[in-house]
Design a protein with these regions (language model features):
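Residue-level signature for tetratricopeptide repeat
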Residues: 35-39, 72-73, 109-113, 147
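Extracytoplasmic/periplasmic C-terminal soluble domains
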Residues: 103-173
Length: 173
């Protein structure tokens, strides 16, 4: 509730409190702290928290979750070096949806970091295959918008950006 209300000082005091320290493991508290820094757009402290958490020896699923979260953050920050390191780790994941996740992360890296536009046909195919999956459609439309922007096609950029925004509102409704 404190995070939703953006009452950051109280939130920080609660996380640092004795009772919270006794009830919740350090990783969970630090992960919550990371999320609060991301919401605050406090990039310096978010970077520090990512460095701390990524340096821990974590169970596989926690590691996968954290690495993908960090990758998305650093791609959004256009941090080529950290994005590339995390993408390399993501490509090493095994099991479940690992291959599909790695492929989508590669598309994000190519689009947002390398500013490529050569994946438009593939992204359009993937969008058709997404069907009624609004979350996936939103993500793919956003990548398509950026690829068209990278290509210099302002009309298509605006078209897919608007579609992505509509799906985003439907997902968050």
């Amino acid at each position: 509730q404190l995070m939703a209300a953006k009452q950051w000082d109280e939130f920080d005091r609660l996380l640092d409190g004795k009772l919270t320290s006794m009830l919740y493991p350090r990783y969970n508290r630090d992960y919550l702290r990371l999320n609060s820094y991301l919401l605050r757009e406090d990039h310096k402290r978010a970077d520090e928290m990512f460095d701390l958490l990524l340096g821990l020896n974590l169970p596989k699923m926690q590691r996968v979750d954290l690495v993908i979260k960090a990758f998305n953050y650093y791609v959004g920050q256009e941090d080529r070096k950290k994005s590339k390191e995390l993408l390399h780790e993501i490509k090493g994941f095994e099991g479940g949806q690992a291959e599909a996740v790695a492929h989508e992360c590669q598309l994000m890296y190519d689009t947002m970091i390398l500013k490529r536009h050569n994946d438009i046909p593939e992204l359009e195919r993937m969008l058709k295959e997404a069907g009624d999956d609004k979350v996936k459609s939103c993500r793919l439309e956003y990548l398509l918008a950026l690829q068209y922007k990278n290509k210099g096609d302002e009309a298509k950029f605006q078209e897919f950006l608007e579609k992505s925004g509509q799906h985003s509102m439907a997902v968050n409704a």
